[in-house]
């Protein structure tokens, strides 16, 4: 066990990034939090890099298009802001960029002339479908070290954490995640 390469890698990981902040005397939950944060940051940075290199697009634009892809009837810009957890100004800027590139369209909301409904255009749908397929391959690749049972167990454990957080946090905090 002493020469197990996975233990060497874990010891090395303890000294990287967020995890370097945790000392041996720190509570196990703090070390877990820092490992989750470090892992998430690594994955997010890699996805950002690949989206930029492969498609010339930011993660923010990808996430925006993903929300619209799920909403076949489009979304109000205020709904996009809430779902993406960004300001209305950020959504307006992204909408302007994506509309200029022909990836989204906006039209006045029938029930509220002050609101805009944003939808993916046919070009936007095709572009997002290609990106989403690549994105899924990347995520599968990044998690290739986990077998199906490990993925299911981690998914379940993180689901338990999410439920706990939703119950513990104030409604306004829980709704934004």
Over which residues does each language-model region extend?
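Charged, amphipathic alpha-helical coiled-coil/dimerization segments
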Residues: 2-11, 15-21, 96-156
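Short helix-coil-helix linker/hinge
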Residues: 55-61, 90, 121, 144-147
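Residues within helix-turn-helix
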Residues: 77-78, 89, 96, 116
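N-terminal helix-turn-helix DNA-binding core of bacterial DNA-binding proteins
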Residues: 41, 45-87, 101, 173-177
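Base-recognition residues in the alpha-helical recognition helix of bacterial helix-turn-helix
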Residues: 34, 63-66, 92-94
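N-terminal leader segment of winged-helix/HTH proteins
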Residues: 1-55
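Exposed, interaction-prone assembly regions rather than primary DNA-binding/catalytic cores
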Residues: 152-177
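Short amphipathic alpha-helical segments with heptad-repeat character
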Residues: 33, 37, 41, 85, ...
